[in-house]
């Protein structure tokens, strides 16, 4: 099947406007991370809607304990590998740690991910303090995905990988951050390790799609790290489900994940967090 046939068979490429339409129609987005051509192609065949080249590659590909050592050059390389495989899925690339400390630096590095890597959207961690950068990126035609809740690039500041937004003040701050990012021009938001009730409230409040990871089933879509889905992670997080451990091989695991997200059977209550 040619690339054009694949696009036609899957209903066309996933775009910002298509994701908004899916939110309006109540059709969940099935998203995964990917870091190379082979697995990205497998995700394409399984019908994954969005592929994130996450700085999580620092941990699952490079073997670091955190995402902090990942460089922009690393991200460009892996984004380029993934983008070559994608005809339908939206390609999103992370701005890694310390790559967007100022608006001009962030614009330059986001431009690299788009021009050199082939990304169609960039993701950055942070709330209202990133609004100026988000606005500048949007003005330059660069789609943006925000990231709130647990922000792995701040792991040392927050004291580990912990659920965020359980306290009322924290929940209110997260809502304000989400609204600020949307107002600045963000096109998508990822919520990580957030109480399910709060995540659903934010999903209903925002007009842009909200994708959860460890944020319950009330979001507009779900994303997991590929390695967790395939069951190759030694100690997977509690919000993940190892579809690959259920038998059938890589393609069966990816198809099962996509089907479960679209049917609303994943995540279950056991994969989320209470306030």
UniProtKB/Swiss-Prot annotation:
UniProt record, GO biological process: pantothenate biosynthetic process
Enzyme Commission (EC) number: 2.1.2.11
Cofactor notes: Binds 1 Mg(2+) ion per subunit.
Record carries keyword Transferase: yes
A single GO molecular function term of this UniProt record: magnesium ion binding
Residues binding 3-methyl-2-oxobutanoate, per UniProt: 55-56, 94, 123
SUPFAM superfamilies from the UniProt entry: Phosphoenolpyruvate/pyruvate domain
Gene3D superfamilies found in the cross-reference section: Phosphoenolpyruvate-binding domains (3.20.20.60)
Residues binding Mg(2+), per UniProt: 55, 94, 125
Catalytic activity entry: 3-methyl-2-oxobutanoate + (6R)-5,10-methylene-5,6,7,8-tetrahydrofolate + H2O = 2-dehydropantoate + (6S)-5,6,7,8-tetrahydrofolate
Any GO CC annotation of this UniProt entry: cytoplasm
Keyword field: Cytoplasm, Magnesium, Metal-binding, Pantothenate biosynthesis, Transferase
Record pathway: Cofactor biosynthesis; (R)-pantothenate biosynthesis; (R)-pantoate from 3-methyl-2-oxobutanoate: step 1/2
Oligomer status and interactors: Homodecamer; pentamer of dimers.
Function description: Catalyzes the reversible reaction in which hydroxymethyl group from 5,10-methylenetetrahydrofolate is transferred onto alpha-ketoisovalerate to form ketopantoate.
NCBIfam families in alphabetical order: panB, PRK00311.1
Name of the protein: 3-methyl-2-oxobutanoate hydroxymethyltransferase
The species this protein was found in: Halorhodospira halophila (strain DSM 244 / SL1) (Ectothiorhodospira halophila (strain DSM 244 / SL1))
């Amino acid at each position: 099947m040619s690339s054009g046939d694949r696009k036609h068979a899957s209903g066309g490429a996933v775009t910002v406007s298509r994701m908004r339409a899916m939110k309006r129609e109540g059709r969940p987005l099935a998203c995964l991370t990917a870091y190379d051509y082979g697995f990205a192609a497998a995700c394409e065949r399984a019908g994954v809607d969005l592929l994130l080249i996450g700085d999580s590659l620092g941990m699952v590909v490079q073997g670091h304990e955190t995402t902090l050592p990942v460089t922009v050059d690393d991200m460009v390389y892996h984004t380029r590998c993934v983008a070559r495989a994608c005809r339908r899925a939206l390609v999103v690339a992370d701005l890694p740690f310390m790559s967007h400390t100022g608006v001009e630096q962030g614009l330059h590095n986001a431009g690299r991910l788009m021009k050199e890597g082939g990304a169609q959207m960039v993701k950055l961690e942070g709330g209202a303090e990133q609004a100026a950068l988000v606005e500048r990126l949007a003005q330059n035609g660069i789609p943006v995905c925000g990231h709130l809740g647990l922000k792995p690039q701040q792991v040392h500041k927050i004291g580990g990988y912990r659920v965020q937004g359980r306290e009322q003040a924290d929940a209110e701050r997260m809502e304000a951050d989400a609204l600020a990012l949307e107002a600045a021009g963000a096109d998508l938001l990822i919520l990580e390790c957030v109480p399910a009730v709060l995540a659903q409230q934010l999903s209903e409040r925002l007009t842009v799609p909200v994708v959860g990871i460890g944020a319950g089933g009330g979001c507009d879509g779900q994303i997991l790290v590929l390695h967790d889905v395939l069951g190759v992670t030694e100690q997977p997080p509690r919000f993940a489900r190892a579809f690959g451990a259920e038998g059938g091989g890589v393609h069966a695991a990816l198809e099962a994940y996509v089907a479960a997200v679209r049917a609303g059977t994943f995540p279950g209550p056991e994969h989320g967090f209470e306030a």
